[in-house]
């Protein structure tokens, strides 16, 4: 299972980017957790950033790897997801690197 980490808060097109990444991974046979879909089931306007990150950490723990989307370095949330995944000994790599193989 692969978790997708990428900028959300400051990117109005984040849903399209996450969806495209998820589709590419699924076409290669991977099971994917797309956190951009959480907005469909979690009332984000009623949750703090910390509460959302708490949920994402639990989802990350269900995965074997985390892939990053371009621009993740500028997102504090992504930085925290990557650090958490590395601390949990998950494979962490840019999506481009995974898709090259």
Predicted regions span which residues?
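Conserved catalytic or regulatory cores that recognize and/or transform ribose-phosphate-containing ligands
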Residues: 1-101
